[in-house]
Amino acid sequence: MTSNTLISGKVDVEAASLRRCASRRHLLIAPMLLALLPHVDAAVSAPRSVLIQWNGAALQGVRDAKIGVPMAARALAVVHTCMFDAWAAYDEHAVGTQLRGALRRPANERTQANKERAISYAAYRALADVLPVDTESVYKPLMQQLGYDPNDNSTDIETPTGIGNVACGAVLEFRHHDKSNQLGDLAQGPFSDWSNYSPVNTPAIIPAPAPAANPDHWQPLVYTDATGSLVSQKFAGAQWCFVAPFAMTKGEEFRPAVEPGPAKYGSPEYQQQAEELIAISANLTDRQKMISEYWSDGPYSEQPPGHWAQFAQFVSARDHHSLDDDVKMFFALTNAMLDASIAAWDAKRAYDSVRPVTAISTLFRGTKIRAWGGPGKGTVEMDGSEWLPYQLATFPTPPFPEYVSGHSTYSASAARILTLWTGSDHFGHSVTLAAGSSKIEPSLTPALPITLKWETFTAAADEAGMSRRYGGIHFERADLAGRKLGRLVADRAWAKAQTYFDGSNTSSLRDLTAAK
């Protein structure tokens, strides 16, 4: 989702633009964090817990760090796990993911003030580690506005400051060695691939791609991005299938659920799925275009995991959450999306499947088709090799294989967690997209304001999946498989989260001395 295409309640386009530059101008102090975030209606936008404020800071960090989608999911999970583990020390039953009940404080210390302080130190340490770009501009000012010293590195576990620092330190120590390569110690550069992935096809230059040598496999693209730089795609997160999950046993655990995988070149299904996307492209309505843009969550955004973390903020305000409620809900939500990233990227790596932009240009080269012709051009006749998805020319297709849809997996997983948490699929949220607010067809699309409304979490997740078909990013099979995968991952993550909530998790305890 691009930040300046949305009006939600009383949050206007100017506020959305401010949000992007806020970190540079030190505007993201706590009272303004939610006001500058889309998706959260003004009527329910006042911060209701310190965790919501830190979640807002984390989302700004994701935007400014410009990291890949699975890395964003991991970052949010790390931050919320650090906060959960710190909070657990002040709960009667809950245990942390790393130190279990070793940090538990006596009943007389289980105050709101102690919880908030411990959570804030944990969040600050986590954000400075996983999303350091905004440490000076966002996280330190928020700590100071809350009345805490960001330079206090105490590890005295008889204090909430020490609890926060120690609990977070244990989580970070674990995640520094989870095979994501955050530290760049497995291969040069943070999050770089250490698994020796190599694409089957040579890169194709956009907007005139050459046919793929192997139309069953992903083809990297070469294009000019929003900064004017020439980009040659590499598989972002090629190693992600090996990352240590939260609840799954391994990245491939649920792969059988998405078999037999994508359609094969030469099959009727392969031809049919391409024709379906061409037909969608030729008949795009303003509503479909704006659904595609609203859910796109591309560069400079909070990414799909952050989009659902914002929806969770709406749920928090709608349901009048306590701090304890927020800690537990966001812990389950973000860790489910972490596992969704691992499961989806396992399928992407295993099937290495072709994107529509490659499949269609290869199949219909030399054949006249009718499709969207580019910004403001409507539907035109073109050679099939000229087909492009309804996307910004500066980011025509994401840098990884097609099957399964990441958007579908994240969204189905998040929707399932929010349903399980609230006990109902009811969502009741909406956003209004202003006339002419399109980033792809500015001032032209939509002709009139368009309101997207979701009665249920499932409806929102399904629309997110469908948006990638409207946008020419995914075929139907990848969308539906992603939805199925996301629900399976969420059910497993939810069950695992309960063992931390009720203290029944009995896996081995980490050494407290080492954590300090």
Report each predicted region and the residues it spans.
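N-terminal secretory signal peptides that target proteins for export/translocation
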Residues: 1-22
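N-terminal export leaders
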Residues: 23-28
